[in-house]
A protein has these predicted regions:
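Acidic catalytic patch
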Residues: 16, 41, 64-92
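Residues that scaffold the ATP/ADP-binding catalytic core of kinase and kinase-like folds
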Residues: 11-13, 50, 124-125
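Short active-site oxyanion
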Residues: 34-37, 74, 110-113
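Short, well-structured N-terminal submotif of metal-dependent ribonuclease cores
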Residues: 1-39, 54-60, 67, 131
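Short beta-strand scaffold positions
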Residues: 4, 38-39, 77, 97, ...
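Alpha-helix capping/helix-boundary segments
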Residues: 8, 43, 82, 101-102, ...
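Acidic, PIN/NYN-like endoribonuclease modules and their adjacent C-terminal/linker elements
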Residues: 1, 103-131
Length: 131
């Protein structure tokens, strides 16, 4: 298994930098189900942030990228089940993906609730506002 950093996935997805994109493509396309790439939870969060913030990717495009990652047999995605849950929340409302993931991770850990000051996160994800 080979760990994949956010920048490798960004280059593969965007194909915007010829040399790095080609190297990322060769690496990712060489992966197999027996020797997969590993995508950490942090990498997923960074990938979403980079695509939305730096590339102005539409929410629908980000969702498609995440669904593709999660369906790819040649990738092992850390906590894929929790990411799927967060993705469903992300699709269904206006919350940031990170907020959806934070709430779902806390839920999976057995937390009674997730505390926040963010009103949008309260409305969209079911977090509890404090203060």
């Amino acid at each position: 298994m080979i760990g994949l950093d956010t920048n490798v996935l960004v280059r593969y997805v965007t194909q915007d930098e010829p040399m790095q994109s080609a190297k990322a493509s060769r690496l990712i396309e060489s992966l197999t189900a027996a020797s997969p790439g590993f995508v950490s939870l942090v990498t997923v969060v960074e990938l979403v942030w980079v695509l939305q913030s730096c590339y102005a990717s539409a929410k629908s495009d980000v969702v498609m990228v995440l669904e593709t990652l999660l369906h790819t047999r040649e990738l092992t995605v850390e906590h894929a089940d929790i990411i799927w849950q967060a993705l469903r929340k992300f699709v269904a409302n206006t919350a940031d993906f990170a907020d959806c993931l934070i709430e779902r991770c806390a839920h999976a850990a057995g937390c009674e609730y997730t505390a926040t000051f963010d009103l949008n996160a309260v409305k969209a994800t079911g977090m509890k506002r404090i203060g």
